[in-house]
Curated annotation (Swiss-Prot):
The gene is purA. The keyword Coiled coil does not apply. GO terms for cellular component: cytoplasm. Homodimer. CDD domains: AdSS. This is Adenylosuccinate synthetase.
Length: 426
């Protein structure tokens, strides 16, 4: 029996889906435990490319159980759409399990998300306008609607009427926009619930049963640790806990978690606003963006690009208890003459190794870089560290030294067979 968490160590988009799919080959269950359909991940299998936002990456392993845990906020419309899309490509989804305790995103959450973001003006945080934050707000306020409620026609109607009365008052009196209609939302979303009913169960029982039977469980974190609402660059963060939310979001106790696998790119990217100390604004950043196809899976927005930041990685290692590191996109850096690694920050004339909580301090931080020579050789077929060109190997090993984590895998391309194992996780 082994349980492992796969979590992004930067600002999301690190390639967690690929690693989860790769590691999921030896797992008996794969589970999402936080976030919502703002967390796009891309899986490439042969000639087919799949873009998923809610369904765990493990769905492509038909003999595995795929779980959407209670900590996820679920847009039923998005989930039904994903399921239909997979069915169209003959992907078996019978092993999907949806927590009856997961909270539901409804149209008023999405509308409120957009209105709240627009009202912030220059202080906007870069939300994906998917209703994630407002859904978590309702959850904390104890007025949310859960999947179990969605399946109960009378209870769903009662709760929806109560919530719409409150939200429509906000829309008409505060934001001065049109109210939402109860009947259309109720009919549409109740039908979604009926379509999802076959997947709904107590997923905590499912996951703990797998562990009790000596099976392997892989937990898939969404976004990244620097987007964690507590440990990230607040308020430019998501509304959940990628770093430590696995137990509360899955119903599997902390004592049953064995490994925490951090995923990072060989550089850094970020979507949306917020601090980014190593951000590049020159042709080097453009080169990496183009070479790495750095555009958001969900939004299509160009990602911001920067050098690898070991201050960020050490922060992530500490707050999430990382035990191993998976390094992706090493091949993207091919062709750059010089590579830089941020090893510390300078703040008001002082060298610091911590990641500041204060946005004003972060704005005054200047990265301290270590420079390494780049490489021109094609590395997309490399299978071992020893096969890498000298400069590429030196770069990978230097990152590992600075972060002080064992390197479990390194990837030299998007395909499953381009992810190379250095240390077994299972």
């Amino acid at each position: 029996m082994t349980s492992a968490v796969v979590v992004g160590t930067q600002w999301g988009d690190e390639g967690k889906g690929k690693i989860t799919d790769f590691l999921g080959q030896n797992a008996d269950a794969i589970a999402r435990y936080q976030g919502g359909d703002n967390a796009g991940h891309t899986i490439k299998l042969g000639e087919d490319t799949y873009h998923l936002q809610l369904i765990p990456s493990g769905i492509f392993n038909s003999d595995k159980v795929s779980v959407i845990g209670n900590g996820v906020v679920v847009n039923p419309k998005s989930l039904v759409g994903e399921l239909r899309g997979l069915a169209d490509k003959n992907v078996d989804t019978s092993q999907l399990k949806l927590s009856d305790r997961a909270h539901v995103i409804l149209p008023y959450h999405i509308k409120l998300d957009s209105l709240q973001e627009a009202a912030k003006g220059d202080q906007k945080i870069g939300t994906t306008n998917r209703g994630i934050g407002p859904a978590y707000m309702d959850k904390a306020a104890r007025s949310g609607i859960r999947v179990a409620d969605l399946l109960d026609k009378d209870l769903f109607a009662t709760k929806l009427k109560q919530n719409l009365a409150e939200k429509n008052a906000l829309f008409t009196k505060i934001y001065e926009v049109e109210a939402l209609d109860f009947d259309s939302i109720f009919e549409e979303y109740y039908q979604y619930g009926q379509e999802l009913k076959q997947y709904v169960c107590d997923t905590s029982v499912v996951l703990n049963d797998v562990l009790d039977q000596k099976g392997n469980v892989l937990f898939e974190g969404a976004q990244g640790i620097l987007l964690d609402i507590d440990q990230g660059t607040y308020p430019f963060v998501t509304s959940s806990n990628p770093a430590g939310g696995v137990s509360t979001g899955s119903g599997v106790g902390a004592s049953r978690i064995d490994e925490v696998v951090g995923v990072a790119k060989a550089y850094t990217s970020r979507v949306g606003d917020g601090p980014f100390p190593t951000e590049l604004f020159d042709e080097t950043g453009d080169f990496i963006r183009q070479a790495g196809h750095e555009y958001g899976t969900v939004t299509g927005r160009p990602r911001r690009i920067g050098w690898f930041d070991t201050v960020v990685l050490r922060h992530s290692k500490r707050v999430a208890g990382l035990t191993q590191l998976c390094l992706n996109c090493v091949d993207v850096l091919t062709g750059l003459k010089t590579l830089k690694i941020c090893v510390a920050y300078e703040l008001d004339g002082e060298r610091i190794d911590r990641y500041p909580a204060s946005l004003s301090e972060l704005a005054r931080c200047t990265p301290i870089y270590e420079e390494l020579p780049g490489w021109d050789e094609d590395i997309t077929g490399v299978k071992t560290l020893e096969e890498l060109p000298v400069n590429a190997r030196r770069y990978v090993e230097r990152l590992q030294e600075l972060v002080d984590l064992p390197l479990a895998t390194f990837a030299v391309g998007p395909d499953r067979d381009q992810t190379n194992i250095l240390k077994a996780i299972w």
